[in-house]
Amino acid sequence: MKFTLSWLKDHLETDATLDEIVEKLTDIGLEVESVDDRAAFRAFTIARVLTATRHPDADKLQVLSVDTGDGKPVQVVCGAPNARAGLVGVLGRPGDYVPGLDVTLSVGKIRGVESFGMMCSERELDFSDEHNGIIDLAENAPVGTSFAAYMGFNDPIIEIGLTPNRADCTGIRGIARDLAAAGLGTLKNTLPDAVKGEGETPVKVILDQDAGNPFCTGFALRMVKGVKNGPSPKWMQQRLKAIGLRPINALVDITNYVTFDQGRPLHVFDAAKVKGNLTVRTARDGETILALDQREYKLNAGMYVIADENGPESIAGIMGGEHSGCDENTVDVLIESALWDPRMIARTGRELGIVTDARYRFERGVDPEMMVPGAEIATKLVLELCGGQPTVLDVVGYKPHTARVIDFPVTEVKRLTGLDVSYEDAFDILKRLGFGVEGDGKTIRATVPSWRGDVEGKADLVEEVMRIHGINRIDPQPLPSHGAVNGRILTTLQIRTRHARRMLASRGMMEAVTYSFISEAQAKAFGGGKPELKLANPIAADMSDMRPSLLPGLLAAAQRNADRGFDDIALFEVSGIYEGDTPDKQRRVAGGVRRGTAKVEGAGRFWAGNAAPVGVFDAKADALAALEAAGAPVDRIQIEAGGPEWLHPGRSGTLKLGPKVVLGTFGEFHPDTLEALDVSGALCGFEVYLDAIPEPKAKSARTKPALSLSLFQSLKRDYAFVVDAAVEAGNVVKAVSSADKKLIVGVQVFDIFTGASLGEGKKSIAVEVLLQPQDRTLTDEDLEVLSKQIVASVAKQTGGVLRG
């Protein structure tokens, strides 16, 4: 919301300075976002260059004799390439502050020649980036006058950021009212008397709506005959330009002016272009309207229009139509002031993608009691600027506003804010804000004014009292100290999340944050798409479902990087997925994707050989590393071949703890999945469920036991077993490990071989077994006994035999 200082003072009688006004606005909750005070240029003078001679000691400098209008030329040294005799520019004198250079001018010598000022460029004055030369004004610019006055920069522009509840401050009068209540002046009475019209308005208004649920709660219409519509006066144009509006013509500018002045949107129709009466009704499916922004909008039955016999002439409360717009040929004008349902305005504006000053105000809620005065203000301006003869104002469907009454115990201020405010002060503040007040010394019975539709209860009155009384008057208090924090601060799941995140980052993966919303097609490709997980009001068509997996978002992110030249990339995310619409169906998951050659050991080409494409074992290693970091008992995890349908059936696995607890899945992606997501390249991924990891058993002692290291040398033994081709290597590893759990501390597969020499349907799996004796050195007899145990265990559990 922008306004100029002089515009504010039309409503506020005050002697406060600009700085005081700006500070007070922020204090009372109307936060000032910017102040454009070009009046700071008032010290700079328009001056004419009389002569320009070359500097005696510098080829690129000139010595100028400058006329400032007082008959006493000033000598200035200047290096601008466009400096010349006859140029009219802007002179800064000693003592003037130059904002673009952040310096204060003084008399100085430049290469031995005194300079008594500076001819300025636009960038040096900080109102544009132009710096190719000094400012070159029109030849008839008045020499000796203030540059700020000449440019119309005497009026500072203030911009405030409004919260959605403060609809009353979408007009400058509302801002002035708050400042007056805060003690910074007196609110002027600027509302005019009703304009006396002659004769009825020939165009009637028909409200075609459900009387029990109206979308238009009032409509005022008046015709002014015989107007002369030309440019608006200079003062109005300057104010509109200052707040970023483009002057069009007097009639249109008046509606814009009243919109910002009073927070009361209006519209004007060229009466000659309106056929028959005006009907406020729902739009018909397929109807179109060419709006004032020169765009054609397709309407539907959920929208509302003001129509005549030709069809829609205005999108109600949002934007008028081009067909009935006012131009320089307008003679008879219809002035409209109406009340619209804020929800209807917001919905229609959102569907059509239209943002206007009228929509901004109506969807927040305008003052219902300003409908008629707003029309009177506009009528008075039309008569002053365009002439004409008004008819009687025709008001349809309006019912007087019923004020809300709130019983407000003043003790609520102390209870909710800790601020001590007396009954008398609270009473006075609410009265100054326009509330009707009466009370018994303890409780104030407050009648909410029509312009404060956001005040609904006691807490809102506390806010009003507090912001006017002054938040800065709250005494600062130190936070109470309760000593050291006892016990654990983070939950188990938070600790697991932190550890998993650090582990995956340490493995060369980059953390990503993807949307929790994905398209229906993506959701179905990853086991989702349930009706209860569809968004009621999605922000986009491709963000309609809550994600059942982290992998769709990560795959899309990896592909976007690949499209931009980053083919080898590893991404991970630790976040939530959704299996249902209840809290227990939201799971905490760590997921990751590797693409191209983005392996742990490095990606791309290097002197010792090119990195191979990522595959199932890279995803498996990531999944196990994340689970181990999160505290899962990885030594007890079982790995089953195969995974969910979005993974390759022969190159994927499932990590389980017992027959029921699934800790995660990993593998390469199914080609159909990649095609559905429009993703290509070598890709693998994983997901581990951090909330499925069992809680560790409680330990009797908080300290870790002493580390016990064996004093005896460890040793390794290799074994090769011939097994059926369907036997998994993991089962052989488990069988070997179970032969002697105390002595065998590690088993690793180092070779898998298939060939005719083994027989049809057979394969050889070779493992390295790490042995660690604890109490003595192993003898040959001990190793022989252990070998027999290993062979017997493998034969029993897998049917394998020792390869000869």
From Swiss-Prot:
Assigned keywords, A-Z: Aminoacyl-tRNA synthetase, ATP-binding, Cytoplasm, Ligase, Magnesium, Metal-binding, Nucleotide-binding, Protein biosynthesis, RNA-binding, tRNA-binding
EC number: 6.1.1.20
Molecular function in Gene Ontology: ATP binding; magnesium ion binding; phenylalanine-tRNA ligase activity; tRNA binding
Gene Ontology biological process terms, A to Z: phenylalanyl-tRNA aminoacylation
Cofactor binding, note field: Binds 2 magnesium ions per tetramer.
Domain FDX-ACB: 710-803
Cofactor requirement: Mg(2+)
B5 domain sequence ranges: 401-476
Keyword hit for Cytoplasm: yes
Name of the top EC class for this enzyme: ligase
Catalytic reaction list: tRNA(Phe) + L-phenylalanine + ATP = L-phenylalanyl-tRNA(Phe) + AMP + diphosphate + H(+)
Signal peptide (UniProt feature, chain positions): none
Superkingdom of origin: Bacteria
Residue numbers binding Mg(2+): 454, 460, 463-464
Gene Ontology cellular-component annotations: phenylalanine-tRNA ligase complex
Cellular location(s): Cytoplasm
Subunit structure as annotated in this protein's UniProt entry: Tetramer of two alpha and two beta subunits.
Similarity comment: Belongs to the phenylalanyl-tRNA synthetase beta subunit family. Type 1 subfamily.
Annotated protein name in UniProt: Phenylalanine--tRNA ligase beta subunit
Highest classification ranks of the organism: Bacteria, Pseudomonadati, Pseudomonadota, Alphaproteobacteria, Hyphomicrobiales
UniProt gene name: pheT
